[in-house]
């Protein structure tokens, strides 16, 4: 079983995927940089969690 992510992380990740779909890939490191460019995230931990959620979502869409 995986970890349950907070609603804020899911909502923010899905909004970013909708607005900037072409910027995100299945590479976590690239997604960290993309999240930093397109959104004002206050902490590194939050940025990483959102980037991780986006990475997992993109991998599921491509599978």
Curated annotation (Swiss-Prot):
Keyword Phosphoprotein: no
Keywords: Ribonucleoprotein, Ribosomal protein
Record-annotated membrane-spanning stretches: none
SUPFAM superfamilies noted in UniProt: Rps17e-like
A Gene Ontology BP annotation from the UniProt entry: translation
One family name in Pfam for this protein: Ribosomal_S17e
Coiled-coil intervals: none
GO cellular component, one term: ribosome
GO molecular function: structural constituent of ribosome
Disulfide cross-links: none
UniProt family annotation: Belongs to the eukaryotic ribosomal protein eS17 family.
Protein name: Small ribosomal subunit protein eS17
Native species: Methanococcus vannielii (strain ATCC 35089 / DSM 1224 / JCM 13029 / OCM 148 / SB)
Upper lineage: Archaea, Methanobacteriati, Methanobacteriota, Methanomada group, Methanococci
